[in-house]
Structure formats: C-alpha cells, structure tokens
C-alpha cells in the first residue's frame, strides 16, 4: 500500500511542552498518527531532540524546525513508497540524517515518522499493531504473546517532582498476578491505599510528572516504608517471591558531581539522612543495604552513566537484583555491547526516542534478548496519549513495561491498551513473571 502524504505538526506533551506529531496518509483514505514523547532527566548519549531555541515561542521549546524537516526534507522521499517496506524506509530516514546522534534532522522528527510507518504497515497488512510488530518486524510467528509486567511508579521524586526525594521513581512490581488485568487490579488497590495512608498522615497527595504521589518525606526509607504499608493494607504480601515487590529508578547521573554521589534535595531540605555524599563503593553499599531491608527486585541507573566499573561491581555482588541500564545505554547498540563486555547490568531500559528510529531500537532489543539481558519498554516523563509502546512491548516480547502510575490519562492509556489486547488475545497472552525475573 502506497504512502499518499505525510504531515508533521506541533502538539503538546503531558507537561504542556511542544512535541512532534506526524500523520501518514495511505491509499483508500486511511491514515495513522504518531506523537513523540520527551524526557526530563536525559542521558548525554541520547540522540538529539531538536528544539528551536527561539525565546519568542514556548520559551525556546517549540519544535518548528523538526516539523519543517519532516514536511520539507523527509516527506518527498516517502511519497508513493510502499509502507510495508519498513526496514527500507527506516534506513532511508537514517541516511537522510546521516549523523550518529540525529543532529541534522532531529531524533524527534525521525522517530515520529518511523513510528507512523510502523502503524501504517499494520493497517496495510490488516493486522493489529502488536501482531505486525511481532511477525513482520521481529519475524516471530509463535501464536503466544507475553504480557509485560508493569513497573508502576507510585512515588515520584528527583527531576519528576517538586519534593525533597532524590530517588526519581519508587515503583511496585506485581509478581503475584497471574494475568495483566490482575496485575492492574493489584496496582490500583495499592495505589488507592497509599493515597489513604498519605492523607491520614497529613502528607501531600499532589502528583508528579508520571502520575505518582510527590510527598515531602524525611528520607528514602520513609518512601519505601509507605509503599510496604500500602501493599499490606491492600491485603497483598510484600515479597520478592511471587508477592508484590519494589523497584527504584535512582537516575544517579542527576546526583553525580565532582566524582561523588550526592543526595542534593536532601541537603537543600535538611532531611534526616545520616550521609548525603558517597564514593562509588559507598554508593554501591547504600543500595545493597537498602535492597536487603526492603523487597526491592529492580534498581535502574544506580550509578552515573559513565561509571561502568560501579555498575559491574554492583551486579557481581547483587546477582539477585535486576540492575537496569538507562542513561548507561540510551537504547544504543554500541553502548549495550560495551555493557555486556563489562557485565555491567542484566537489564536495559528501552526508550525509542533515545536513538531516534524503530529499526535501531529493534536492533538493541534483539541483541539484548540474544544475550539474556532483560528488556523493559519505557515511556518518558513528557508523554502523550499515543499508545504505541503498549503494542510495542507485547510485539517485541519485552516482558516488562514502565509507563508511570495509575493516574494521568497519558499513562493510563497505555495500561488500557494492554487490557484491550488481553481481551483480544485471551489465553494467548501469557503473564509469566518467573520468565523475566529468574534471578530473584
């Protein structure tokens, strides 16, 4: 099926900042739309998110240049092309930019087009998006699919909230569930119990960027204790063994300065932490000790993006924890290969806008899976209502998904899309935590 037209335009993300939307028009008056997310805590290895820098528009945040690049440079090369030739078209995008970090056209321009080509291909193939991704892009024809285990961000801190918590995300992971819908039920009940506990203790129930609560607390322990209380109050068992466990995104690159790890918010708010500055070895011990006191099964970016030795030593000493690389890898095959050589982590966070195209994202996922590295499909803190990553997580067999809390519709939309897919696939969609958490 031929591409008839392509149009990029500016929309807003969940923070009210401009982002790129792309609409693809196919034969027979069919069309699809993609919207590009944006991060707050970004790794230095990420592909360039092109913004205008014009102070007269959206405080320099507008994306008119990226939109012009789609409409004036990319569009003419795609007209009348067969939308089903995904890899050929995606390679065309990469070559049109011609730079390693997408600095010519912008990763936000390229990704919008890349996603919309995938969506258009699914329409042309008359397949659900997740099935098209699995069969036509991953070349996997097994009739069974894996439902992603949700890592739900219930307490927000760091760059995602205006509170005194330095850890960016405090999450719950429902390993107890036997289906995705039961996992969502578990999460919803815990989320609402957490709200009751916060109110009862006169703590703020305002939400952060990703829909989690953003209270002012004494320290990181207090946040974890609140989650454990909420799990118990909702009549679940806080445990790494088929219970409801915890996960963290430390975003350590945001806390690293002068070769030290520093709890910056804790310092500025005079909280009760006994220690606020750590060497790499002390930092590793802090997280190991924390994981021994709470049912923590996964820690993301527990070291700076360039502290390869720190990651490697932590994984060696904590093989029972899922150690996730986000800023460490930035969904870039070159850095993942280095990480595997270093034995740096046993999991990678996948954010398509960090690399800029879906084909390059698929290369990273395939390489990770071939090397027994867990893959977690992730949203960004500046999200849209686009549910692409829900289908993507199922289509590539990622096994896990991070898409925020159980509030804010741009987060809920992804969960609801997976629930919809569950209804379509029924028992062909398998929720199997033990497959993806073998080390717990």
Swiss-Prot record:
SUPFAM superfamilies: Enolase C-terminal domain-like, Enolase N-terminal domain-like. Catalyzes the reversible conversion of 2-phosphoglycerate (2-PG) into phosphoenolpyruvate (PEP). It is essential for the degradation of carbohydrates via glycolysis. It comes from Ureaplasma urealyticum serovar 10 (strain ATCC 33699 / Western). Mg(2+) binds at residues 249, 300, 326. The lineage of its organism: Bacteria, Bacillati, Mycoplasmatota, Mycoplasmoidales, Mycoplasmoidaceae. Its cofactor is Mg(2+). The gene is eno. Keywords: Cytoplasm, Glycolysis, Lyase, Magnesium, Metal-binding, Secreted. GO terms for cellular component: cell surface; extracellular region; phosphopyruvate hydratase complex. GO terms for biological process: glycolytic process. It is found in: Cytoplasm; Secreted; Cell surface. It comes from the Bacteria. Disulfide bonds: none annotated. This is Enolase. (2R)-2-phosphoglycerate binds at residues 168, 351, 380-381, 402.
């Amino acid at each position: 099926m031929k591409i008839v037209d392509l149009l990029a335009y500016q929309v807003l993300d969940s923070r009210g900042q401009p982002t790129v939307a792309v609409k693809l028009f196919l034969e027979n008056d069919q069309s699809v739309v993609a919207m590009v997310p944006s991060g707050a805590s970004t790794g230095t290895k990420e592909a360039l998110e092109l913004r205008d820098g014009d102070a007269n528009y959206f405080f320099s945040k507008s994306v008119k240049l990226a939109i012009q690049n789609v409409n004036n440079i990319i569009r003419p090369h795609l007209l009348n092309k067969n939308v089903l030739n995904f890899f050929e078209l995606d390679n065309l995008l990469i070559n049109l930019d011609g730079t390693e970090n997408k600095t010519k056209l912008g990763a936000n321009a390229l990704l919008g087009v890349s996603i919309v080509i995938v969506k258009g291909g699914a329409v042309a193939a008359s397949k659900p998006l997740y099935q098209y991704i699995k069969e036509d892009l991953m070349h996997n024809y097994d009739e069974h699919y894996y439902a992603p285990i949700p890592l739900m961000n219930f307490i927000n801190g760091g760059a995602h909230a205006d509170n005194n918590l330095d850890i960016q995300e405090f999450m719950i992971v429902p390993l107890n569930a036997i289906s995705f819908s039961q996992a969502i039920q578990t999460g919803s009940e815990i989320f609402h119990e957490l709200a009751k506990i916060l109110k009862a203790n006169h703590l703020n129930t305002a939400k952060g960027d990703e829909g989690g609560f953003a209270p002012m607390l004494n320290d990181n322990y207090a946040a974890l204790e609140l989650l454990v209380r909420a799990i118990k109050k909702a009549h679940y068992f806080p445990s790494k063994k088929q219970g409801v466990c915890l996960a963290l995104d430390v975003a350590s690159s945001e806390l690293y300065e002068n070769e030290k790890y520093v709890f910056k918010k804790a310092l500025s708010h005079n909280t009760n932490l006994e220690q606020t500055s750590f060497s790499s070895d002390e930092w590793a011990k802090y997280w190991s000790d924390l994981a021994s006191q709470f049912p923590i099964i996964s820690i993301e970016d527990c070291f700076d993006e360039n502290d390869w030795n720190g990651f490697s030593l932590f994984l060696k000493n904590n093989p029972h924890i899922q150690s996730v690389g986000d800023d460490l890898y930035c969904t870039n095959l070159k850095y993942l290969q280095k990480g595997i050589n270093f034995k740096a982590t046993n999991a990678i966070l996948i954010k398509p806008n960090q690399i800029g195209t879906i084909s390059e994202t698929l290369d990273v996922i395939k390489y990770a899976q071939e090397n027994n590295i867990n893959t977690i499909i992730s949203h960004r803190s500046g999200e849209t209502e686009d549910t692409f990553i829900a289908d993507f997580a199922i289509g590539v067999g990622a096994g896990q998904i991070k898409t925020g809390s159980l509030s804010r519709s741009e987060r809920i939309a992804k969960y609801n899309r997976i629930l919809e897919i569950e209804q379509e696939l029924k028992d062909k969609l398998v929720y199997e935590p033990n497959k993806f958490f073998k080390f717990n």
